[in-house]
């Protein structure tokens, strides 16, 4: 018996040693709101696997709750500036301005907003990198890897200053600029649509013209933020000239929050890993009151409605338009909404400050999902095979819904011009037309039929970078080429010069021969 206990203790010690043999230290530069919800899933899994995770954040986040007891460690810097006004301006812009504009106008407006708040973002960055006590502490900790959401600039600068290899996690940048210019992601414009344009991989001639023009617009004019401003700031912080693409381009792995159940087929680099839906999981039981309401729907089922964590209120007029449409369907509706109760609200609709969205979408009685097209919600719908009514508002949402429309799993309506009839028609279409449910289930089967789960793949590559101090063997040589070398402009120029030289020499030889021939004939005639 004693020997059995000794063997058990020895085995446990061995397991402990093996488990900690791969344990490392992870530093995180996150983005708030829905981005944080996605990244947090990765961090929790890293903790389960024994890693030490430290999150960098400021003192006034929206969803990053650093005060709540957690296995995560937080390094918090004080932000004297209240960002409430900026958030309100952004919500107003997204809800009331952007939906009524064309693609380029909305992108320009969005770009202008980010240029306006660059001072706040710079202040936040400075509060980290010029905090000598914090930077010394971070350097002495010797982190193995840094996980960065590049939507907020400065994470790559932190990694450079700390000399830590880093992994990026993102859905897309504005116009896909960062992935294409800094990550060297191939993007043939003939069949790869520029992100955030609402185009698909099946483009007409005029759409390909539009795609090419928008690519130029995004590349030379509209960018995620003021590149010149940040490159000047980065160069000053590093004490040497640099560019955003130089620092961002040093990413070892790019974790893209999509997968081929969502994306159109396209070429990609070996250090790009698609991990869409990593936050999705089987549905859990609903709260009793909510379950009773769902069961009361009978054979008609339920509709789940959410515009995400950012847009929980709409104007009273818009709320009444929505409520009026919902009141006319036989399904019960669970609507995440914090505003004033609409006067047209039907008895079949209940309002909630918060809903267990994943659990509702996984409920067998769910018939449709009304969504703004956020990536997290889209993937929960794909995971559970639920058809969608898309009401995109801004950013990548138009693109996300366009993908779902192209795959036959969604109907889109315009948020700005939407009427009760539009919403009612869209709901009836996705609920009564069985093709939408069939296509949603097809995407769900594709999503579930992966050799390795998205979350496990994401964690694997983070751990891979930790174990190998990077992933340089996956880095394309394109990073070391100038733009004219990358597009073979120098080769094309050389070949054109060769052709021009050959034509020139041929012409000269021909003219010389003609002159000789003419002289010979004249001499013969004289004789």
Swiss-Prot record:
It is an enzyme of class 2 (transferase). The keyword Metal-binding does not apply. It is a single-pass type I membrane protein. The chain crosses the membrane at residues 492-512. GO terms for cellular component: membrane. GO terms for biological process: xenobiotic metabolic process. GO terms for molecular function: glucuronosyltransferase activity. Its main location: membrane. This is UDP-glucuronosyltransferase 2A3. It comes from Homo sapiens. The gene is UGT2A3.
